[in-house]
Amino acid sequence: KHYGKFVDGSTQEIDVPYDIPDTWEWVRFSTLVEIVRGGSPRPIKDYLASEVDGINWIKIGDTEKGEKYINNVKEKIKKSGLNKTRFVKKGTFLLTNSMSFGRPYILNVDGAIHDGWLAISNYENSLNKDYLFYILSSNVVYSQFLSLISGAVVKNLNSDKVASILIPLPPLSEQQRIIEAIESALEKVDEYAESYNRLEQLDK
């Protein structure tokens, strides 16, 4: 039997995606993080700023699929729009909640987010940020997202749905070993890709 932890500290028997080591736990995401939705001042054109002291306006268009970080933004908004949006700090996780939903990014800038984003914060006590990125990028999480929106006409995630997912939680020391193993494997993939591209060029 497997038991999940809930925000109030209670436990309940749950169905889990797969068996995990004894030192790990299946945990409801809501017990580990804070999740909030962004907001959009409208009409947005009235709040866009040209001045250098404007607030970074972080949009999904500022991302690249497959990238891990958001480093730069194209637009800024006026400070008067802050009470109609959500300001988030560097290090916050962002998750797309509509269109190409379920894509995680880590912020490398402070700024304001619109309602196409969910912001995930206060994870540091239980989750290494790199482990959190890889688990949010995994099939075990994405399959739960798909299940949560199945049957919906508009395929959107909200904070309650994301809070309800189960994630496998290893001890922090083991999270670090998992990160190192993943990043070592990714380096080898990049090396093989470079070698393949060189061979392709030689054949031309």
Segments predicted by a language model, with ranges:
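Non-catalytic DNA-recognition/assembly elements of restriction-modification systems
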Residues: 7-40, 168-204
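Specificity-determining recognition surfaces
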Residues: 118, 138-167
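A short beta-sheet element
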Residues: 59-61, 73-137, 158
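Short proline/glycine-enriched turn/loop segments at secondary-structure junctions
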Residues: 47-48, 108, 153-156
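Structural signal for hydrophobic
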Residues: 24, 58, 91, 164-165, ...
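Short, glycine-/Ser/Thr-/acidic-enriched flexible segments
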Residues: 25, 34-37, 62-65, 100-101, ...
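Sequence-specific dsDNA recognition surfaces
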Residues: 9-15, 30-47, 61-90
